[in-house]
A protein has these predicted regions:
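Bacterial N-terminal signal peptides that target proteins for export
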Residues: 1-8
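Hydrophobic helical h-region of N-terminal Sec-dependent signal peptides
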Residues: 8-16
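C-terminal motif of bacterial Sec signal peptides marking the signal peptidase cleavage site
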Residues: 18-20
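Accessory carbohydrate-recognition regions in carbohydrate-active enzymes
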Residues: 24-222
């Protein structure tokens, strides 16, 4: 297997460190009772991605693009994933966001579907809920089309992606700035290649929120 890890930061200037500590004994873990899939069906309009409370970035899978049940980008009855975008609303009656879509792929892919009304992008992957995990701060799914395991976590201002690809395959990623939920208006899109392992970019969107500017930086930790 081949591992590739990405760090995507929504706002530069933050710093975080890791340190060791001793956990208190006899503390009940209430997070074990949390089910992030609650509200992802019916008209709940929630998403299962890994999010820090009040975090500025919300990495989560998108299974559809348009319609009332696409407000959060994820609908439990769906069986395909278009990719993992980094801005979402939860539990709202109006849709927005779905910015900076990242999708791992194997082999050469078509960029766009020929049907502009399709809920599925040309490079989408099928998946099964039996191979999907959502916990507080962690999301994982197996992408059947590419045989890739995707794992996502987040910090207050960044997202951490880890992908496990099949051995001896032509693996890669699609970063789609023109994608957005409800096909909102995207403009001023740009990606800059900083190095072999770093990119940055920006875009401007208009839908529920007018003149929204998105800036991002991504680095491969492979």
């Amino acid at each position: 297997m081949k591992l590739k890890t990405f760090l995507i930061v929504g706002c530069l200037g933050g710093l975080f460190t890791l340190s060791s500590c001793t956990a208190p004994t006899n503390v009940k873990d209430y997070s074990a009772y949390v089910n992030p899939f609650i509200g992802t069906g019916g008209h709940g309009h929630t998403f299962p991605g890994a999010v820090v409370p009040h975090g500025m970035i919300q990495p989560s899978p998108d299974t559809r693009i348009d319609g009332w049940d696409a407000c959060s980008g994820y609908y439990y009855a769906d069986s395909t994933i278009n990719g993992f975008s980094h801005t979402h609303v939860s539990g709202t009656g109006c849709c927005d966001y779905g910015d900076v879509l990242l999708m791992p792929t194997v082999g050469k892919q078509q960029y766009r579907t020929t049907d502009p009304q399709s809920q599925r992008l040309a490079y989408a992957s099928s998946f099964s809920h039996k191979n999907e995990i959502a916990e507080p701060g962690y999301y994982s799914v197996f992408l059947d089309t590419y045989q890739v395991k995707a794992e996502i976590s987040s910090t207050k201002r960044g997202a951490i992606h880890r992908y496990t690809f099949p051995e001896n395959t032509e693996s890669g990623f699609i970063i789609d700035l023109d994608y957005s939920l409800q096909r909102q208006t995207n403009s001023e899109m740009e990606i800059e290649v900083i190095s072999d392992t770093e990119i940055c970019g920006h875009k401007k969107t208009t839908y529920w929120a007018f003149d929204q500017y998105i800036n991002f930086y991504a680095k491969s930790l492979e």
